[in-house]
């Protein structure tokens, strides 16, 4: 599971195309969004989505889904990201493991869908607009903020990927019936906004990794305060620390899976006598 902005891509996804289209600087747009959120006591994610609609309307620019998807083509990624997913999936397959990749992001789903890496994801959980009959964005359809990101970890755990299906998500399910056990999960994010998911991984036996562009005390605190298992530069190239550690985690998962299966088979044999 991956965050997106500053985890896979090098900055906030709106910075590449959307904000320049408004003839604004990144600082101007995010200053307006942040001040709006603070003055109105708004969820910061809803504040930026409102700012996108407001700024577009004020400039008589339609905010169309297809335009946002098109903006995904200009998103820039950290080194190694583009071939990371196939490389890791192929590695897992050699060990008998089926590796799946998911995005859980507070960024825009439409922009992520337009990127060249979107085809690698089984599901993309991110913010999304509702559009009117003319195709203009009018309302937030999905808001993924820092704390409700954990909802999507549970969805992956149970295999309930439809965000409109809350009934099955909340239905009791035996642990051995859950599609992806927590112990078989890795969450990769870039900072404090990912802490709820990172701590959830550590609490339930999964793994969390913080990536960074420049090491500072904040990312080191995540490790020292046991909020993450590992910290690495955001370089996804082969044989980097990040690459080798993720592969080692998958090796461990494969061995644990074999031991679990052996335990299960022995119990079945005893019960079948």
Regions found by a protein language model. Give the residues of each.
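C-terminal cap/substrate-recognition subdomain and adjoining C-terminal extension
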Residues: 73, 79-102, 106-273
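Alpha-helical substrate-recognition element adjacent to the catalytic core
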Residues: 1-133, 228
């Amino acid at each position: 599971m991956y965050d997106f902005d500053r985890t896979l891509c090098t900055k906030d996804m709106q910075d590449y195309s959307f904000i320049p289209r408004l003839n604004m600087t990144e600082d101007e747009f995010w200053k307006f969004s942040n001040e709006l959120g603070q003055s109105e006591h708004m969820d910061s994610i809803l504040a930026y989505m409102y700012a996108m609609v407001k700024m577009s309307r004020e400039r008589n620019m339609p905010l169309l889904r297809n335009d946002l998807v098109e903006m995904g083509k200009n998103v820039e990624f950290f080194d190694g990201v583009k071939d990371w997913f196939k490389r890791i999936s192929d590695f897992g397959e050699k060990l008998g493991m089926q590796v799946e990749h998911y995005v859980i992001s507070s960024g825009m789903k439409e922009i992520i869908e337009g990127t060249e890496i979107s085809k690698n994801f089984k599901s993309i959980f991110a913010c999304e607009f509702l559009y009117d009959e003319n195709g203009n964005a009018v309302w937030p359809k999905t808001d993924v903020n820092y704390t409700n990101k954990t909802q999507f970890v549970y969805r992956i755990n149970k295999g309930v990927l439809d965000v409109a299906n809350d009934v099955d998500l909340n239905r009791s399910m035996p642990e051995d019936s859950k599609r992806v056990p927590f112990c078989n999960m890795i969450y990769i994010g870039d900072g404090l906004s990912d802490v709820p998911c990172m701590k959830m991984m550590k609490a339930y036996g999964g793994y969390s990794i913080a990536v960074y562009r420049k090491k500072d005390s904040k990312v080191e605190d995540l490790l020292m305060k046991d909020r993450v298992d590992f910290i690495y530069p955001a370089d996804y190239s082969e044989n980097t620390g990040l690459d080798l550690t993720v592969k080692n985690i998958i090796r461990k998962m494969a061995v644990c899976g074999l031991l679990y299966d052996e335990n299960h088979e022995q119990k079945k044999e005893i019960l079948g006598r």
